[in-house]
Amino acid sequence: MIRIRTSSSTVILAVVIAALSTFCLAEPQTWQIDPNHTAAQFSVKHLGISTVRGQFEKASGTVSFDPSDPTKTSIEATIDASTVNTRVQMRDNDLRSPHFFEVEKYPTITFKSTRAESAGTGKLKVTGDLTIHGVTKQVVLDVDASSQPINDPMGKGLRMGASATTSVDCRDFGITYMQGIVADEIQITLDVELTRPAK
């Protein structure tokens, strides 16, 4: 029979390490949006009979998250408006033009959160300022942050996923071209992958 002797000091050390690990996990964490694994997607009704879908190909930003108090979550994100892609070149050029996003004058779409509220386990309602076409309006994102962090398989720190949805009225942002052909309400879905260095 093999007996394993454990001293009281070893037990105390293990407890301290566990407590410190928990404390570290509870600290506010800043995550970077990974543009290579993030999609800012939108959909809009065309003639009231079909749905046109597209996305912006380039997004960046940061998310600050406190596991012990998710209501302290803050988000800052920037989208390159010129990267709009609906898979139809003529339509994409029109979306970049003064008819819609006017990307030469307003090259970015930005979001900056102002408040976060719990909406259930792993769920948040994040209120913030959305700026499109040079106009800023308050919107609420329904956020699913139930994903748990994992170790990057390439050894580059930690990764975590999140998603968010909202809808906006393009008229609120001064975009009124082709009313009656393209619906005013736009559905937005964000699928985000976040990264941060491992401690």
Language-model segments: residues:
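Low-complexity, acidic/polar, glycine-enriched regions of mature
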Residues: C24-K199
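Bacterial N-terminal signal peptides
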Residues: T10-T22
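Bacterial N-terminal signal peptides that target proteins for export
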Residues: M1-L13
